[in-house]
C-alpha cells in the first residue's frame, strides 16, 4: 500500500491494531507522506507500549540514505547492511565545467556509440518530458547522417511517468543484434526500476524538483542540481548486470560541492494538506516529532490557508471544524476538498468531481512529435472553450464518457491515456 493510505487508516485507528510489522521501503526518497508516517508510527509504537498492547515493529529499507540520521531519529535503532549484487562502475567526469548539459550528454553518447561494442546500452538522465523528447529527436536526426550509416544501429526510447504504458515497455526491451538502445529518462530510473542491458550511464547532474516559497504562497518546479546521494545512485545503474561506466557531464569539483543528501520534500512544499491530515489524527505539527522540522513561516502560512478554507477554527490553537474533518477524509489538496464539500450547495457536485479528477491526472494532451504536430493541435482545438481551461477539461471528459470506443477516442483525438 502507499504511505497515504496508511496515514488515512491512522485517522480511524490511532493504534493501527491490524498491523504487527510495517516495512517502509525507499525511505531515502523522503516524500512528505514518508516523513509524516515516520512520526505517526513512532507515536503508535509509544502508545502501544504505554497501553500494554502488542509491539509494532518497523523495518526501514533504503538503497542509499543518511543512516546515522535515521538511526538517531528512531531512538538509536540497530542498522543492518545487506550487500547488493552490483558490479564495478568506472566514473568519468568532465575536465571543464559544461555550459550546456544537453549538448554534453549527446556528445558523450555518440562518443560511446562509435567506440563501444553493439548491444551495450546507454541510460541518460534528464529533467523532464520536454527535454527527453527534444533529445530523442536530436538523436534520431543525427543517426540519419551519412557519417553514421553502416555503423551499429542506435535506437532511442523515452522513459518518464506520463508516458503511455506500452511506450514505457519499449524502454525495457533489450537491444537486438547489431543495435544499441539508449534510454533517455527522468529520475524515475534512479531507484524505482531496473533497466536490463544498461552498460553506460550519462548523468547530467540535474533534476526537476518542486519548491515552495512560503512568503509568496507559490509552488514552482525548478531544474536544480542533484545531491551526491543521487549521483551515486545514478552511477549504480551501470553496474546491475556487469561492469559498467558512468559519464558525468560535470567536474569532480562540482560533485564535491553538491549537497550530500536530497532536501526532504517536507522542507520545500505547501504544508496545508499535511497539517490537515495530522490534525485529523489528533496531532499538532508544532509538537510533532518530525525527522526534519519545517520552518515556522511555512507552518504559519499553512495554518492561515486552512483557516481561510474554514478547515480550522483559529490559527493560534488549531482545531478542526466539522468541514475540516470531512476535508481530511479526501486524499486531495485541501482546496479541492473544500470545493467538493461545498459543491452540493450549488448543485454541481457531478461536474466538480469530474473536474477535480481531470485536474488530478497528468497532462491530458499527448505531446505531438514533429510529424503530426499540426494534426494533433487541430484535434486539441476542437475542445477549446473560451470560458477557460476548466470548461475545456469538462468538455473533454464529457465526450470521453459518451464515447463507445474509449481507446479509439484517445487515439483519434491525440489524448493521453491518463484518464
Locate each region found by the language model.
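Structured, non-catalytic alpha/beta "coupling" segments that mediate domain-domain communication
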Residues: 56, 348-368
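A short, surface-exposed interaction/processing loop segment used at functional sites
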Residues: 380-383
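P-loop NTPase motor module signature
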Residues: 1-346, 355, 376-377, 387, ...
Amino acid at each position: 500500500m502507499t504511505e497515504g493510505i496508511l496515514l488515512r487508516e491512522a485517522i480511524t485507528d490511532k493504534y493501527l491494531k491490524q498491523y504487527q510489522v510495517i516495512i517502509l521501503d525507499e525511505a531515502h526518497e523522503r516524500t512528505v507522506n514518508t516523513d509524516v508516517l515516520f512520526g505517526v508510527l513512532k507515536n503508535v509504537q509509544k502508545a502501544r507500549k504505554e497501553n500494554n498492547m502488542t509491539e509494532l515493529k518497523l523495518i526501514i529499507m533504503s538503497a542509499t540514505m543518511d543512516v546515522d540520521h535515521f538511526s538517531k531519529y528512531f531512538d538509536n535503532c540497530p542498522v543492518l547492511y545487506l550487500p547488493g549484487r552490483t558490479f564495478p562502475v568506472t566514473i568519468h567526469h568532465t575536465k571543464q565545467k559544461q555550459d550546456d548539459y544537453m549538448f554534453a550528454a549527446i556528445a558523450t553518447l555518440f562518443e560511446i556509440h562509435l567506440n563501444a561494442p553493439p548491444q551495450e546500452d546507454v541510460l541518460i538522465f534528464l529533467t523532464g518530458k520536454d527535454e527527453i523528447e527534444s533529445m530523442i529527436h536530436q538523436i534520431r536526426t543525427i543517426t540519419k547522417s551519412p557519417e553514421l550509416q553502416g555503423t551499429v544501429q542506435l535506437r532511442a526510447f523515452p522513459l518518464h511517468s506520463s508516458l503511455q504504458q506500452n511506450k514505457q515497455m519499449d524502454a525495457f526491451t533489450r537491444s537486438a543484434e547489431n543495435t544499441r538502445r539508449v534510454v533517455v529518462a527522468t529520475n524515475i530510473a534512479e531507484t524505482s526500476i531496473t533497466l536490463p542491458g544498461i552498460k553506460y550511464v550519462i548523468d547530467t547532474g540535474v533534476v526537476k524538483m518542486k519548491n515552495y516559497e512560503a512568503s509568496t504562497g507559490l509552488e514552482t518546479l525548478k531544474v536544480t542540481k542533484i545531491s551526491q546521494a543521487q549521483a551515486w545512485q545514478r552511477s549504480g545503474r551501470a553496474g546491475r548486470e556487469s561492469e559498467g561506466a558512468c559519464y558525468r557531464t560535470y567536474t569532480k569539483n562540482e560533485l564535491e560541492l553538491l549537497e550530500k543528501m536530497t532536501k526532504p520534500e517536507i522542507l520545500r512544499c505547501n504544508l496545508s494538506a499535511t497539517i490537515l491530515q495530522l490534525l485529523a489524527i489528533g496531532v499538532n505539527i508544532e509538537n510533532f516529532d518530525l525527522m526534519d522540522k519545517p520552518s515556522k513561516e511555512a507552518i504559519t502560512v499553512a495554518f492561515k490557508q486552512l483557516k481561510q478554507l474554514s478547515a480550522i477554527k483559529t490559527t493560534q490553537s488549531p482545531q478542526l471544524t466539522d468541514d475540516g474533518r470531512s476535508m481530511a477524509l479526501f486524499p486531495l489538496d485541501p482546496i479541492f476538498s473544500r470545493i467538493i464539500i461545498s459543491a452540493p450547495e450549488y448543485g454541481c457536485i457531478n461536474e466538480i468531481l469530474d473536474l477535480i479528477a481531470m485536474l488530478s491526472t497528468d497532462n491530458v494532451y499527448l505531446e505531438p512529435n514533429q510529424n503530426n504536430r499540426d494534426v494533433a493541435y487541430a484535434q486539441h482545438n476542437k475542445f477549446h472553450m473560451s470560458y477557460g481551461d476548466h470548461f475545456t477539461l469538462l468538455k473533454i471528459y464529457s465526450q470521453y464518457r459518451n464515447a463507445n470506443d474509449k481507446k479509439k477516442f484517445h487515439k483519434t483525438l491525440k489524448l493521453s491515456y491518463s484518464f
